[in-house]
Regions:
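Active-site recognition of the HExxH zinc-binding catalytic motif
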Residues: 107-120
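N-terminal start-of-chain detector that recognizes signal peptides
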Residues: 27, 78-80, 99-101
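Metalloprotease/metallohydrolase-associated module, dominated by Zn2+-dependent proteases
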Residues: 2, 6-69, 74-76, 87, ...
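Membrane-water interface of transmembrane alpha-helices
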Residues: 119-128, 195-197
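Short pre-active-site segment immediately N-terminal to the catalytic Zn-binding motif
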Residues: 90-110, 137, 141-145
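Canonical hydrophobic alpha-helical transmembrane segment
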Residues: 80-91
Length: 269
């Protein structure tokens, strides 16, 4: 159940979860309840700013990965090799369905914990919290875009894995410890991507309440930036070359849009 005080924007997040579905029982607040000016601004920001930035970032990441794939030193480096091994472990576990309930519970718990951490970062209060296989919710006196969408682009378990590793590495600074870090990041990143892709098509109120188009573009762009940070951690990309690719791809995108605009003008004028 989701309850919303439209004056104070107090919200209760409650999602019912199983291996087949994830849905909110009711929605008292929706994107259409926002002022028309706010809706227009979000659509404009998503279309004119976030979408072009996401396209340029995706194109530049593809260029960087193409450069990296041609370098055996990068492909067989310790970070990339062990991250791929961790990802392979997730693929085996995810496809076997032997631990579906446990993995689903971890995702539900992580989803609600991320909401809770976002509330704390936003100086809000948490009044109730629940996460189990039957459902999960967080009740808070504060809501904003970051609180609503943070579980879709912040891989909580990967972040906690990195935090635990950082403490461990202070006392055990070995190559083995580094291998554990990279393999764990590969596993938990794939875990995050899989469940995020699984849950988004299931009519999530978190996305709809902020405008589905705006939310999807923002989540996509944020995940691209986190993926860039992960690749940089693995020394698989160069920030200097990435920025150069961004400038080049921005010019290409501008040329394409200009040509399309001229073509449309020729057809209708």
């Amino acid at each position: 159940m989701r309850q919303c005080n439209r004056d104070a924007w107090n919200k209760t997040y409650r999602a019912q979860v199983s291996s087949e579905y994830w849905e909110d029982e009711c929605q008292e607040f929706s994107f259409m309840d926002l002022p028309r000016r706010t809706r227009f601004i979000r659509h404009a920001v998503a279309t004119l700013i976030l979408l072009p930035l996401a396209l340029i970032t995706a194109m530049s990441l593809c260029d960087q990965l193409a450069h990296a794939s041609g370098s055996l030193n990068i492909l067989f480096s310790i970070p990339v090799w062990y991250a791929l091994m961790g990802a392979a472990v997730w693929v085996v576990l995810g496809s076997s369905r032997l631990f579906t309930s446990s993995l689903l519970y971890l995702y539900v718990l992580g989803h609600e914990l991320t909401h809770a951490l976002a509330v704390i970062c936003s100086h809000g209060s948490i009044h109730a919290f629940k996460a189990d296989l039957d459902g999960g919710y967080i009740q808070t006196d504060k809501n904003n875009i970051f609180i609503s969408l943070s579980p879709y682009f912040l891989p909580l378990w990967a972040m906690l894995w990195g935090l635990v590793w950082g403490v461990t590495y202070l006392f055990w600074p070995t190559v083995t410890c580094q291998a554990i870090l990279y393999s764990g990041l590969g596993f938990w990143w794939c875990f995050h991507l899989f469940w995020t892709a699984w849950i988004i098509p299931k009519d999530q109120p978190d996305l709809a309440d902020n405008g589905t188009f705006f939310s999807l573009i923002l989540v996509y762009f944020a995940n691209l930036l986190l993926f860039l940070a992960l690749l940089r951690l693995f020394n698989a990309v160069s920030l200097h070359r990435f920025l150069a690719d961004c400038i080049h791809n921005a010019e290409k995108l501008w040329d394409v849009l200009r040509d399309l605009a001229m073509l449309a003008a020729g057809l209708f004028l």
